[in-house]
A protein has these predicted regions:
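C-terminal substrate-binding/active-site "lid" region of AdoMet-derived donor-dependent transferases
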Residues: 87-153
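S-adenosyl-L-methionine
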Residues: 1-5, 43-70
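A short SAM/SAH-binding and catalytic strip from SAM-dependent methyltransferases
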Residues: 72-90
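Conserved class I S-adenosyl-L-methionine
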Residues: 7-16
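Conserved SAM-binding motif I beta-strand of class I
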Residues: 30-35
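Glycine-rich SAM-binding Motif I of class I
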Residues: 18-22
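Helix N-cap at the beta1-alpha1 junction of Rossmann-like dinucleotide-binding domains, i.e.
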Residues: 38-39
Length: 165
């Protein structure tokens, strides 16, 4: 879907194993992975022998995204809003808003409809308040099986949004 929308680069933030960056590169999109855990970055470095994407070991909220020379990126935020994802996404959004060349960006959030997590009053699978606060336009949501992501019986909704600036 990211390629269909027209995004040129994918930045996988916090997925852990770099699966989103890996899949993006398979689709011939330039891709980067930002992960704070050095052991997970070592795992990603083993994957780049198969397909060339760019893993970085860094705190995504302080990483210098201007060094990537991005054109029309989509940022995939790993982690549920209710489990630290909201803070992670807010920190990255703040960094990106400081880059004058990046006014048009995509944001993709992994959500949940599970009853065991607090509900966001604006919905969007836990991301509604953040989406509204940051003036993001929801493009589409797709649901994927969670067997390969979280230990949940529900599917994982991915909410594709875009900055309105």
């Amino acid at each position: 879907l990211a390629k269909e929308i027209g995004f040129k680069e994918i930045i996988d933030i916090g997925s852990g194993d770099g699966r989103i960056a890996f899949c993006a590169k398979v689709l011939d999109l330039e891709s980067y992975s930002i992960e704070i855990d050095d052991m997970l970055v070592e795992l990603q470095n083993k994957l780049i022998t198969l397909i060339d994407f760019h893993p970085y070991c860094s705190d995504a909220t302080i990483f210098d995204y201007s060094t990537l020379n991005l054109g029309y990126p989509a940022f995939f935020i790993g982690g549920l809003a209710q489990m630290g994802g909201n803070e992670l996404a807010s920190g990255v959004l703040e960094k990106i808003h400081l880059i004058s060349d990046l006014k048009k960006t995509g944001w993709v959030f992994a959500g949940t409809t599970s009853q065991k997590y607090p509900v966001d009053s604006k919905n969007k699978s836990g991301w509604g308040t953040l989406i509204e606060k940051n003036n993001l336009n929801t493009i589409q949501s797709i649901s994927l099986p969670t067997a390969w992501t979280f230990h949940e019986s529900d599917e994982t909704p991915y909410i594709f949004t875009q900055s309105l600036d």
